[in-house]
Amino acid sequence: MTQVTIYTTRWCPFCVRAKALLAHKGVAFDEIPVDGDRALRAEMAARAGRTSVPQIWIGEQHIGGCDELFSLERRGGLDALLSDRP
């Protein structure tokens, strides 16, 4: 399964939703909490071009946030990305 990385904050409801969808699908992910860590938040913003959380990557592909993750799931594209081998 492709590596999934998600930048989060502890109190973000969109982060909770995104993580719940991934967990429901049995996907292990690397969570990078950016609460109060300016360096990690700056890293996320530089990588994503966005400052909002969550920011999600599947492999090297930036998915975006929670809305984009759920949209990908509704279109039937999430499982294919998750099962891709690099």
Regions found by a protein language model. Name each.
Residues 19, 47, 79:
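Chalcogenol-based redox active-site neighborhoods
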Residues 1-28:
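Local sequence-structure signature of Cys/Sec-based thiol-disulfide redox active-site neighborhoods
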